[in-house]
From Swiss-Prot:
Active site annotation, chain numbering: 117
Residues modified to 2-(S-cysteinyl)pyruvic acid O-phosphothioketal: 117
Gene3D superfamilies, per the entry: Enolpyruvate transferase domain
Recorded metabolic or biological pathway in which this protein acts: Cell wall biogenesis; peptidoglycan biosynthesis
Encoding gene, per UniProt annotation: murA
Organism: Vibrio atlanticus (strain LGP32) (Vibrio splendidus (strain Mel32))
Name of the protein described by the UniProt record: UDP-N-acetylglucosamine 1-carboxyvinyltransferase
Length: 422
């Protein structure tokens, strides 16, 4: 059965309040990092997502006791399997994050080569190279990455060949239990990395510099237990702010933080929105204001996030003037544009740039979700289009948005989930 969304568009603004979930991109590495802990950990503000369920199942396969009642509880004292098998990994690229913690704590680990969204080339080389520099032996065989080390990993000075969130997390986690100090240069600076470091430090790790491009990790002999609340999802926050902006509405996002998405907020203000922020909330008001096209260049944090690019493509399409969007992070990340063009959007793609603007109106159509963030832009487009939009393959959306239809409905959208046998 393939699940789909039916969205009935309207010219009524999307307005109201929305409670933002914890960030998937912090919750996942934190759950994998819990493999390092020799005592139970409790992680709260974890979003309800398929990738989270898969990760909990994977931890159980390794021998951990995992339960969820509000918070997620992980007790890794009895981990006795060191392999993340293909049947779980194939749907989720994040599984590579099991490798570093397994080899750091147990001296061995293997992970099937990963799957996930279809956005360009995303190799695991940087993860592998980092672990090798910490003293692990890596072999690739039968579709598995196998890591091993005699004794403990050894601290090292590592310069990342390119900025990678995933590899920064792998190396940082593995280095927590290494002998000696690791200095990680050219590390990624994303808030989710800071959150993972905060979690590890609560368990007894000695990590400093997370959020800068040099992270220092003094290895410790063991990690204990602890409690941690996952940082807010900045991309979900931005998605709902854009929904209000393109529909001429007013929305308040709760349980989130302005410092997480300063680049996107600056662009929303440039686009004509009134943005206000406070302790744990952000509001955007577009009532009776004109939407103006903005120039976007995606870049690693603290630059404009690639995961907000599709939403701002839609914003530019509906705005006055012409906006150029340049995608520097991933190749093949304009797959949402042909789908939006089916709804009547105006855009031209030239290489890694998209030029959009001055779309009079969108008309409902059958569209297909291709990757996680692009799919959200199709759903929002459906909310402001004339007529009915059917969004197919919404399992992409479910991988990263916690109950998006309930949250949009609360803002006045007419959206329902249905399934039909293919």
């Amino acid at each position: 059965m393939m699940e789909k969304f039916r969205v009935i568009g309207s010219d009524k603004p999307l307005s109201g309040e929305v409670t933002i979930s914890g960030a998937k991109n912090a919750a996942l590495p934190i759950l994998f990092a819990s493999i390092l802990a020799e005592e139970p950990v409790e992680v709260s503000n974890v979003p309800h997502l398929r990738d989270i369920d898969t990760t909990m199942e994977l931890l159980k396969r390794l021998g951990a006791k995992v339960s969820r009642n509000g918070s997620v509880h992980v007790d890794g004292r009895e981990i006795n399997e060191f392999c993340a098998p293909y049947d779980l990994v194939k749907t989720m690229r994040a599984s590579i994050w099991a490798l570093g913690p397994l080899v750091a704590r147990f001296g061995e680990g293997q992970v099937s080569l990963p799957g996930g969204c279809a956005i360009g080339a995303r190799p695991v080389d940087l993860h592998i190279h980092g672990l090798e520099q910490l003293g692990a032996t890596i072999v690739l065989e039968d579709g598995y990455v196998k890591a091993s080390v005699d004794g403990r990993l050894k601290g090292a000075h590592i310069v990342m060949d390119k900025v990678s969130v995933g590899a920064t997390i792998t190396i940082m986690c593995a280095a927590t239990l290494a002998e000696g100090t690791t200095v990680l240069d050219n590390s990624a600076r994303e808030p989710e990395i800071v959150d993972t470091a905060d979690f590890l430090n609560k368990l007894g790790a000695k990590i400093s510099g997370a959020g800068t491009d040099t992270i220092t990790i003094e290895g410790v002999e063991r990690l204990g237990g602890g409690q941690h609340s996952v940082v807010a999802d900045r991309i979900e926050t931005g998605t709902f702010l854009v929904a209000a902006a393109v529909s001429g509405g007013k929305v308040v996002c709760r349980n989130t933080n302005a410092h997480l998405l300063e680049a996107a907020l600056a662009k929303l203000e440039e686009a004509g929105a009134k943005v206000e922020t406070g302790e744990g909330w952000i509001s955007l008001d577009m009532t009776d204001r004109e939407l103006k096209a903005v120039k976007i260049v995606t870049a690693p944090h603290p630059g404009f996030p690639t995961d907000m690019q599709a939403q701002f493509t839609l914003l530019n399409m509906m705005a006055k003037g012409s906006g150029v969007i340049t995608e520097t992070i991933f190749e093949n990340r304009f797959m949402h544009i042909p789908e939006l063009q089916r709804m009547g959007a105006k855009a031209e793609i030239e290489g890694n740039t998209a030029i959009c603007g001055e779309t009079e109106k969108l008309s409902g159509a059958q569209v297909m979700a291709t990757d996680l963030r692009a799919s959200a832009s199709l759903v929002i487009a459906g909310c402001i289009a004339q007529g009915e939009t059917i969004v197919d393959r919404i399992y992409h959306i479910d991988r990263g948005y916690d109950k998006i239809e309930d949250k949009l409905s609360a803002l006045g959208a007419n959206i329902t989930r249905f399934s039909e046998s293919n």
